[in-house]
Amino acid sequence: MDGMQLFSRPSVAALLMIATACRLMPTEAIADGAFVVDDALIGKPGECKVESWVSVASNHDFLAVTQPACVINAGIPVEAGATLLRTRSDGEWSTSAGPKAKINIIPLGDQGFALGLSGNTLWNLNTGQNIGSNINVPFTIQATKDLRININGGWLYDTTVHMGYGTYGAGFEWNFVQPLTLIGEVFGLAGQRKEGRHVTDPRAQIGLRWTPAEFIDIDVIYGRNLFGENANWFTIGLNLRF
């Protein structure tokens, strides 16, 4: 099986789009890194970060991701970055990469909510073929000082199977005690089940984030059915801000 075939399962190509969609956030934002559900915030021009994580599954699938990003001034602040990922699925390896960007449409102010827009695309570096593209609209509600709720909706086109999917997600970030944050989320795809009954089943993650200093996060996460393969996933992540 070559790299293109590795992503022939719509669940894998599609979830990679969601999981690596533009989740580039400022220092005060929480659910970035390996978490899928995005918030609507971006940072200030000149802020940069690198998010990296490794995930292993009970069925022996594997995912390693690194995402460098900086906020630039392009008339409006834009978080521009790239994704590089290495995957193993059904025993076969593949490498993919692509650009992504995010803007904030409604800032998080006294009204207690914010709205954003992000998009990304990926290419399989083994074959040179585009895997797919994703657009996402994140909506953030600051429920309390220590509790934030994020709701996502969007669209994904998987070029490996020439199918489109609606995308959805909802999550919470609860900073119940310094320096720990509990983060949980449910997300998935809406559309025709072309392959595999678990492709459009809901997916979920819950994890604990330790922030020993304002420039670093360490994540430990448990996930279920992350790529529509009905497996358990364990993730360790590291986020650096500068």
Regions found by a protein language model. Name each.
Residues 1-35:
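Cleavable N-terminal export/targeting peptides
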Residues 30-242:
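Transmembrane beta-barrel domains of Gram-negative outer membranes and organellar outer membranes
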